[in-house]
Amino acid sequence: MQDTSKQYDAVIDECRSLFIKKMSDYGSAWRILRLPSLTDQIFIKAQRIRQLQENEVRRVDEGEKSEFIGIINYSIMALIQLENGVVENPDLNTEQATILYDKHSKITKELMLNKNHDYGEAWREMRVSSLTDLILQKLLRVKQIEDNKGKTIVSEGIDANYQDMMNYAVFAMIHLGA
């Protein structure tokens, strides 16, 4: 399990680095996005990964790895939005956004470590394509919860689904040798 923790941190470090660079380029323009918009961005990334896995021909020179990074970063943005709400104008500088990024990546890693202990690292035996399908399934669940105005009867809330998608994407990146 110690390797998993280190591998997880390496993936998050790569994603975090890109997040910080994009914050420098664009600021926190993403803070205006409502949750369904972030969900749709993650859906686009996951759908592209599935197409890449199924099709031999690629017309855009970007592979699965960059899309999984996008899923991780958009999931953290969604968790930040859930906690802080949507704003009319960007309101976070790079330092503030990075603090929130680190907070949510830490919470999500703790969840992964707890589940990983209980499931005995079963994800290591899974295919990347199965992890992609699980992300797509979680997205459909989130869309349904969003359509239900955030209400669930017996199911986990939206935050748990974003965390699971993020963890599945990290596992996929580890499988891909990130």
Segments from the language model and where they lie:
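Intrinsically disordered, low-complexity regulatory regions
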Residues: 1-178
